[in-house]
From Swiss-Prot:
Xref: PANTHER family: LIPOYL SYNTHASE (PTHR10949), LIPOYL SYNTHASE, MITOCHONDRIAL (PTHR10949:SF0)
Catalysed reaction, written as an equation: [[Fe-S] cluster scaffold protein carrying a second [4Fe-4S](2+) cluster] + N(6)-octanoyl-L-lysyl-[protein] + 2 oxidized [2Fe-2S]-[ferredoxin] + 2 S-adenosyl-L-methionine + 4 H(+) = [[Fe-S] cluster scaffold protein] + N(6)-[(R)-dihydrolipoyl]-L-lysyl-[protein] + 4 Fe(3+) + 2 hydrogen sulfide + 2 5'-deoxyadenosine + 2 L-methionine + 2 reduced [2Fe-2S]-[ferredoxin]
Pathway(s) the chain acts in: Protein modification; protein lipoylation via endogenous pathway; protein N(6)-(lipoyl)lysine from octanoyl-[acyl-carrier-protein]
Protein name (Swiss-Prot/TrEMBL): Lipoyl synthase
Enzyme class: transferase
InterPro entries: Aldolase_TIM, Elp3/MiaA/NifB-like_rSAM, LIAS_N, Lipoyl_synth, rSAM
Annotated keywords: 4Fe-4S, Cytoplasm, Iron, Iron-sulfur, Metal-binding, S-adenosyl-L-methionine, Transferase
Compartment annotation: Cytoplasm
Length: 314
């Protein structure tokens, strides 16, 4: 593809309006008052309204707001992070309670400055959520922690309901897209999760539109399946700023549907695939049956409680 063709106009199916009404502002205030970050906000996710209000799910970003890596697709700021905040786990758990979430995703910036990659705080966050919200299902989305499997054990000992780690792109493009990560290291991390916790669903995500070929996407699916990954999500890469990688191509919704069919035929237990799909999209549907039943019982109790003083209805 020539340089003149790289500046592709965004198609109509990607043009969405971000909801910034009173309820959104209240939620944002809750996050700031508790000194918390969400990927939903950082990435200006187009699905924020649906997840926070309708599906009662949210994705918290812990370990600060500064990443030690500088992946060329990601909008999160990079630099030297602050010291660990050991009060963060309880604040996240309290916010889950106030928001009445039924499913929560906990992700984090990469903390290569820490020996354990932040695994101890990550694990304590999961435990704090579980203590205060026993029926809420929990998905974790960590970095590769530089392949430190002791840190992986620390994470898995906290008992998450889903383990998510994204390969992000196909093998050929990994060095350009996420220079300090390794394709095979990510796959091995996912495989080892199944050794530690065979019944925990594993999940990964692929962005398209960075210059990959269809056969490379299919090969990435095969690689994930070979490492016992259960769930895959596929979404369109969108350039956060002009400093980030340009979009090479926008995939049509029909192409995403085709990729979903391929993924399911290959044996993934669940696949979300669409232009606006992100790693945590419809994450509440992807937990195991046992975890889902625990959540159903919990939510029945939540619905009987009085509404919070904050208005979270959109």
């Amino acid at each position: 593809m020539s340089n003149q063709q790289t500046h592709v106009r965004k198609p109509d199916w990607l043009k969405t309006r971000i909801n910034t009404n009173k309820s959104y502002r209240n939620l944002k205030k809750l996050m700031r008052d508790n000194r918390l970050n969400t990927v939903c906000e950082e990435a200006r996710c187009p699905n924020l309204h649906e997840c926070w209000s309708e599906r009662k799910t949210a994705t918290f970003m812990i370990l600060g707001d500064t990443c030690t890596r500088g992946c060329r697709f990601c909008a999160v700021k990079t630099g030297l992070p602050n010291e660990l905040d050991w009060g963060e786990p309880e604040r996240v758990a309290d916010s889950v309670t106030v928001m009445g979430l039924k499913h929560v995703v906990v992700t984090a910036v990469a903390r290569d400055d820490l020996n354990d990659g932040g695994a101890a705080v990550f694990a304590e966050t999961v435990r704090a959520i579980r203590r205060k919200n026993p029926g809420c299902t929990i998905e974790i989305l960590p970095s590769d922690m530089k392949g430190d499997y002791e840190s992986l054990h620390t994470l898995m000992d906290s008992g998450p309901d889903i383990f998510n780690h994204n390969i992000e792109t196909v093998r050929r493009l990994t060095k350009r897209v996420r220079a300090r990560a390794m394709y095979d290291r990510s796959l091995e991390l996912l495989r080892r999760v199944k050794e530690i916790a065979p019944n925990t669903p594993t999940k990964s995500s692929i962005m398209v539109g960075l210059g990959e070929e269809k056969d490379e996407i299919i090969q990435a699916m095969d690689d994930l399946l070979a490492h016992n990954v259960d769930i895959v999500t596929l979404g369109q890469y969108l350039q956060p700023t002009k400093k980030h990688l340009e979009v090479v191509r926008y995939y049509h919704p029909d192409e995403f549907e085709e990729l979903k069919n391929i993924a399911l035929e290959k044996g993934f237990s669940h696949c979300e695939s669409g232009p606006l799909v992100r790693s945590s999209y419809h994450a509440d549907e992807q937990v195991s049956n046992a975890a889902a039943q625990r959540r159903i019982k919990y939510m029945k109790g939540v619905e009987k409680q009085e509404n919070s003083q904050l208005d979270f209805n959109f």
